[in-house]
Amino acid sequence: MKKLLLAASIICLASAGLAEENPTPVISNSDTEIKLEGFYLFENGYVKQDHLILFDKNVTDNRKKLGFYTEAAFAATIAKTINDVIAGAKIVLQPTTRAKTSTNYNGSHIFIETSYGKVELGSPADASAKLRITGSQVTAGTGGWSRYALLDGQYMRYNGLKSDFDTNASFYLESYSNSFDQINDKAERARRLNFFTPKMKGFQAGVSYTPDTANTGGNRDINNLTLASSGRNGVSVSKTGIKTVKLENNETMTINQNIRDAFSAGLTYEHEISEDADLKLSVTGEYGKPARRLIHAKMDGTTIQVLNTYKLSNLKAYNLGAVFTYGNFSCGASYGNLGKSLTAKEYYKVGRDTYYYNGAVAYGQGPIKTSLEYLKTSRYKNTVDAVSLATEYKIMPGLLPYAEISHFQAKGKPVYYPEAPSKTTRGTVGLIGTKLKF
């Protein structure tokens, strides 16, 4: 804890040194505008968790309980206006740390905007992600406790197989994508076509089309297979949305949860009830077909023998969300259901349904904001409960030091073994960091 307090002191001193007005840089002339924006996060995390074995206790390669985390984004938006038509491009650069992939930055894409709406070509963020409302949108801090917790450690496994858990409110089009774990991958999320209507009497709608969630726009080997002459049932070596699990007797299950012909849509409504009260509502959804089948195979030396293939169910997911603000108080809530999306009974024997709900309340007074959030997820009957208390202080516009403490509990077992005992792990994560946005 002394080390955590020391790190907090260093962060506060660094924040104070940056405390001066720093508006977003904008270069413009009569019809062309260039906007530069960026984000950087430095965070120190401390975790205490039970039932961790050997190196599972390490937050980093050589340190237990304590670790640093950084995240960054930098983007340039160039727009030109001619006869009430705005056309331009947004270019997001790859930083030398983990890239921030939130919908606020939305990745590199071309856009065209008129009075009839906005079209985005090649955007990595779909309409459901941009229009979705969750309770965490009103909170302080980052909600990043899951970066330091280990929910699928050795204690939680059975026959070497990990349990599946969800630690946030996300849909498949977002969660099954390249995660920038390697900064040299030079790949983003799948590319999409988006259309958003203009806001009319508080309403706005959006729709997206994604031909293939494995097509990130920069990758070349779209259909690279490891099995010769295996056709559509082959095992793709792409990392995007694919995992292979080892079973008994040298058998494996390769689960490709990529989607083809994926559609997502959303509808939001904003209403100013009074001078001090605002209400925002949102309904979003996703639909798509599985790109490939689940493959049951057996390893015989260097040879792979396909024993059987199984059809995965279609992607069908929706989210309902609301945010209410009254004066300095804000509260948000959401419920999401993914049903049996992209599962098959031959592997998901414990359960196939996934859902989540979360709620948060926040109070802001001047530069200080404090929030309390609760998250509940259930993925294939494996549950996660988390409560987070966070506070942040705005030193200047865009500069936010914060502190956050979260308590979590995960309970479950591997989906392939219904006979496995259900195990539980609990822990507490403390975060201290600084966010800088310009």
From Swiss-Prot:
GO CC terms, sorted: membrane
Chain segments annotated as transmembrane: none
GO molecular function terms noted in the UniProt entry: porin activity
Pfam families named among the record's database cross-references: Porin_4 (PF13609)
Record InterPro entries: Gram_neg_porin_domain, Porin_dom_sf
Keywords on record: Signal
Name the record gives this protein: Uncharacterized protein RC0098
Taxonomic classification: Bacteria, Pseudomonadati, Pseudomonadota, Alphaproteobacteria, Rickettsiales
